[in-house]
Amino acid sequence: MSEFQVRPDWMAFCLPDISEAEVQADADVIRSGWWAKGPRTMEFQKKFAEYVGAKHCIAVNSCTAALHLALLTQGIGPGDEVITTPLTFASTANTILHVGATPVFADIDPDTGLIDPAEIEKKITGKTRAVVPVHYSGLAADLGAIGRICDEHNLFLSEDAAHAVETRYNGELIGHHPRGTVSYSFYATKNLACGEGGALVTDDDDIAKKAQVLSCHGMSAGAWNRYGKEGSWRYDIEEPGYKYNMFDIQAALALTQLSRMEDMQRRRFEAVEVYQQAFADVPELRLQKTPDYCHHSRHLYVLRIVPERLTISRDQFIEELKARNVGVSVHFIALHTMSAYAKRFGYKPEDFPKAYAFSESEISLPLYSTLGVQNAEYVADAVLDVVKTYRK
């Protein structure tokens, strides 16, 4: 291998894929004068539901909002427990706390980073009301096993699909005729992005109606159109709700991204293939495994170092990549080690040893549809140069 040459410019960890179509779509909305929740939001709800194969879609301003609404529709609250994973972003656990319930963590499968169904079963008590599995990095959680557990114990299933646009379980998109609810993120870094945004999908009419009302102050259905010719100024507040709705500027971006999904995914997978080939036979690195039931959407490229084979730590490895002008991230710092949860529940790192070990060795490499093969090759070479420099 020739000597590694550091590029002069910084390579961002993630960048949104913005074409002229997105610019034009938002310009059209801005010129229309209808910027808030309106016809474009309604169109997106219809098209996204059709895309994933669900009966209902409620477009909201974040996946956090969707996760919160999912629990609210079930009346989950104080005294209840909800099982989830410690290897996730804070919103998964925070929304459980926001309804007054207690998040109960179950450890992961270290090969995938996904919540382990066997660990879920160990955590079930008489207070357990729901399970919130996370489709981590674009891998599908084992919905067959988790669904059976939920059926056996009469538990609500709220899927956190923040990473899972284009993820498939047994050939079907996540969200296809869901057992309970599925919550998505359209944050700027996601496979489908609109800056900030999210969606809740369900096949349940009652859940959909309640979530729709709660997402916009508790206003009665149709209130979004109260300024239109066919609308009515009269509305009711059915129950105190939240300001969670998506608006048309976001929806226009989301619709355009949805129409470009196939091409964006194709280019994302070209970069993944570079990484997979480069790291396949490197004993200092551990690649994420994909279960047979799953089609990985590749929201993240998850790489783990093998600490005992290197003379530097994961944190030092990241600094070495930064010195080579490669931006990376970590997904995630295990929640049970965060002060908000450790202090409240008395957690220690070793309470969830697999999640902790995963968290302490993981590095997320740059991955986005505009990355390109050449840039992916540079990232791979940078990683291999660090390994070569610091292997034992």
Feature map (PLM): residue ranges:
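N-terminal "arm"/small-domain region of PLP-dependent enzymes with the aminotransferase-like
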Residues: M1-W34, P39, D236-E238, P366
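Active-site PLP attachment segment
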Residues: H177-A221, D248
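Structural detector of well-ordered beta-strand residues that form the stable sheet scaffold
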Residues: I58, I83, V104, F156-S158, ...
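Conserved active-site segment immediately N-terminal to the catalytic lysine
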Residues: E159-C194, W233-E238
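A short alpha/beta connector and helix-capping loop motif
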Residues: L114-K123, G171-T181, V383-D385
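PLP-dependent aminotransferase class I/II
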Residues: M42-K46, A54-C57, A118, A130-V134, ...
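Phosphate-binding glycine-rich loop
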Residues: W34-E81, T95-V99, F105-D107, E172
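PLP-dependent aminotransferase-like
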Residues: L72-A164, R168
